[in-house]
From Swiss-Prot:
Species of origin: Gallus gallus (Chicken)
Pathway membership, UniProt: Quinol/quinone metabolism; menaquinone biosynthesis; Cofactor biosynthesis; ubiquinone biosynthesis
Residues making up the signal peptide according to the UniProt record: none
Key words of the record: Endoplasmic reticulum, Golgi apparatus, Membrane, Menaquinone biosynthesis, Mitochondrion, Prenyltransferase, Transferase, Transmembrane, Transmembrane helix, Ubiquinone biosynthesis
GO biological process: circulatory system development; endothelial cell development; menaquinone biosynthetic process; ubiquinone biosynthetic process; vitamin K biosynthetic process
Role according to the record: Prenyltransferase that mediates the formation of menaquinone-4 (MK-4) and coenzyme Q10. MK-4 is a vitamin K2 isoform required for endothelial cell development. Mediates the conversion of phylloquinone (PK) into MK-4, probably by cleaving the side chain of phylloquinone (PK) to release 2-methyl-1,4-naphthoquinone (menadione; K3) and then prenylating it with geranylgeranyl pyrophosphate (GGPP) to form MK-4.
The name this protein goes by in its record: UbiA prenyltransferase domain-containing protein 1
Catalytic activity of the protein: menadiol + (2E,6E,10E)-geranylgeranyl diphosphate = menaquinol-4 + diphosphate; all-trans-decaprenyl diphosphate + 4-hydroxybenzoate = 4-hydroxy-3-(all-trans-decaprenyl)benzoate + diphosphate
Pfam families noted in UniProt: UbiA (PF01040)
Amino acid sequence: MGPAELVQKISINAESPRGGERNDCGAGAERGPAGGWRQKCAAYVLALRPWSFSASLTPVALGSALAYRAEGALDPRLLVGSAVAVLAVHGAGNLVNTYYDFSKGIDHKKSDDRTLVDQILEPQDVVRFGVFLYTVGCICAAGLYAVSTLKLEHLALVYFGGLSSSFLYTGGIGFKYVALGDVVILITFGPLAVMFAHAVQVGYLSVSPLLYAVPLALSTEAILHSNNTRDMESDQQAGIVTLAIIIGPAFSYVLYTVLLFLPYLIFCVLATRYTISMALPLLTIPMAFSLERQFRSQNFNKIPQRTAKLNLLLGLFYVFGIMLAPAGALPKL
């Protein structure tokens, strides 16, 4: 081999990446998009705020349990369909909330949901996902009409009432921004959702689910109120008005305490006057005292999530209590 050929061979070897380098680059190229998709999927989940889904799942379970006690039968297709429909509307409403909070400059680097603030998702991504979920909810509602004996006008009234409320909470009128968000949540994720799940099972609208929804609605409102109390300072800076801002920190604590413990008073009345199975939700009262202490100390870190966990457990024990009640023991069933 001549000197010229030797120099040419060395030059070629220097320009070619080593095998280990090629593997590393290839692996990095493969990991990049996969990691990006994983991050984006996680951002979609975060924007949905899944920790809040107890507010929609427990009313569906309660309405279905009330229907079972009233009719002695439960259609699992209607149970699953109503759960998916309500979850889809709830998730879409959370995305609308994410979009409008970001648009109005309310979300910031310390917010629970920073998917738009950190530019993990674009606003149009959130809009498209919200439209998709609303579409899923409407498809489920159509399926429920095909299976249930409930009249179309009654199904549409309750379902689209809930859908409109989930959008108008922050979209359109924006009830959240004019101190009416608490009223919307109290009605939608309580009486309305319970009535919806009950009606698709039994085939008619009834007043009794509205009464049984009261303890659950109060517990659900506690989630929102704890969130609004925590965010009072940033909400004031953004120029929006919530009930927590209007009544101030001291009365916000009083209201939160009432929302936490009034359901237990109702359960005590039901347990002593009708059936002992209604005392099951009282098993969660230590969690309520723990939350009250945390709120009183103004340590609001994760308190909405912890209140949602209490809401889920309280709702499940409430449903179990109704299912275990002797036939005819509960009023209006």
